[in-house]
Amino acid sequence: GLGDVYKRQVHISDTLTIHVLPARHFSGRGIKRNQTLWGSFMFVTPERKVYYSGDSGYGPHFKAIGELFGGVDLAIMENGQYDQDWKYIHMHPAETAQASADLNAKAVVPGHNGRFVLAKHTWNDPLIQLAKASKDKNYRLLTPELGEPVRVSDTTQQFREWWE
């Protein structure tokens, strides 16, 4: 299950509710660690459900979230800054692909990649590996360049592999 602490929601308006959901990470830096709860978020409107993973290691919470919400239209998923030593707080690309499938996402936009590298992998490895891991999944992998618009409802929109 998701635990009572995560059964929080904020009704922003009649057309937007934000749900606070689990993630597997930590909060803070230095001596002020874990004084706040880390989390992921589901944005629910009458038209669609958009999930934002935040930083998270892979875990059963993704499947539980997918089951609770009956899938998601768009999942914005962490995909980068991973290392075997950080596996409990940052997903490797194959785990991002599986977490997206666990959510029953229709479309996935990877985040946390293609910019400054804090881990030992190359800047483009997260996208290369996620593209490979997503080939047999039931979601559309959307990989816009920085600033490129994404039309969530347009199932014909395609993006070039700009990281190659």
Predicted segment positions?
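Short, small-residue-biased leader/transition segments that mark boundaries at the very start
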Residues: G1-Y6
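Core dinuclear metal-dependent hydrolase active-site scaffold
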Residues: K7-G70, L146-E164
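Cap/insert and terminal regions of metallo-dependent hydrolase folds
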Residues: G57-L146
